Amino acid sequence: MSDRVLLCGAWDEGAGYPRTRSLRQGLEAAGIEVSECRVPGLGQKKQQILRQPWRWPLAWWRQKSHRETLLQSLEAKVAEVRPHAVLVPYPGHGLVRTIKERVAAPVAFDMFLSAYDTVVEDRKIVRPGSLIANHLQWMDTKACSAADLVVLDTPENAAYVQSLTGLPADRFAWLPVHDPDAAPHVEPWQAPGDGVLQLLFFGTGVPLHGLKTLIAAVAQVDTVHLTLVGGAEDERRFAKQVLGERVTVGPTFVDNARLRELLDASHLVAGVFGESNKTQRVVPFKLVHALAAGRPVITADTPAVARWLDGSGVVFTAEAADSGDLAARLRELSGNLDQLATSASMARGVYNRHFGTQQLAERWREVLLRLNPIRFSGGNQAVTA
């Protein structure tokens, strides 16, 4: 009889929301039968609501009705599937406890992002110690305490949330970021015919990204052209102002097919350069996405990146929030195209070794063994993705 995991929650699907699809792919590659019990998440509305705290009560009330719909179908789904474990995907803060009360199987919560970290420390929407900040910390703690196991994306983030909540360290685990849309093959890296390095940035422009640091660095290096997809409106204006013809400002969002075209046309992909503590703890999805596409990356020098990629030869680093150091690295790379070509040739192999589907499957086996050791103790055989 196969091992079964039920995904239950209100997560987002589609372009821009790879996390839950990644986790499902990893489970399936580990030989797990996966079922779902889901209502739609908030999607891109989350970004607007985060910036407008006065909308939080109404958003909570609307989500409450979705939660009731979800719970109405959960009992029947559990009876049908009889899961050996339940995963509550991100965002699931408001669902973990209620789901846990309604299922007999152990429950894992893919926290992915701390509410406190996102709103207080990274985006600085409210001050530490304020009523809202304290409430967000309480939300994080309540959600984590309800789950049998809490999953983050890096060991550094797992340690951060453990410290924030004060819960035992053995309640936390990590599953790496992974590209669920990685193509089976990559386009060969082509050296620039005009000597101009094509640098690609894509992202929402949250403080973690440090986009203005990147723009200021590119302004100092005449041999770099920036293609900018996303970013906040003031950052897009700033890029046009200081870079002129050396920037192509694209849409605020592109689908996966267009993003792949942009990756194929790039020589180097920009990661994150922000000054918040969160920068030190993440391996950004854009880094993983770029490596999967066979493109080298430049990003902030952080413990999280160094843990996996120090010495890999495919990721180049600069000091976080330091446009001067970043400019020096860009200048060096634009003058050493052979090094970039070599890095590009190795990038997909590095992705496969550290972030590929089989690596995620192996991590899942370890996590499931912790979650339900009696059921999953025999599930460590090799499985082909």
Where does each model-flagged region fall?
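Membrane-proximal helix-turn-helix segments that form the acceptor-binding/catalytic region
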Residues: 130-150
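Nucleotide-sugar-dependent
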Residues: 209, 253-262, 267-289, 299-307
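Conserved donor-binding/catalytic core segment of Leloir-type glycosyltransferases
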Residues: 190-209, 215-221, 226-227
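Acidic anion/phosphate-binding donor-loop and adjacent secondary structure
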Residues: 32, 171-172, 178-196, 210
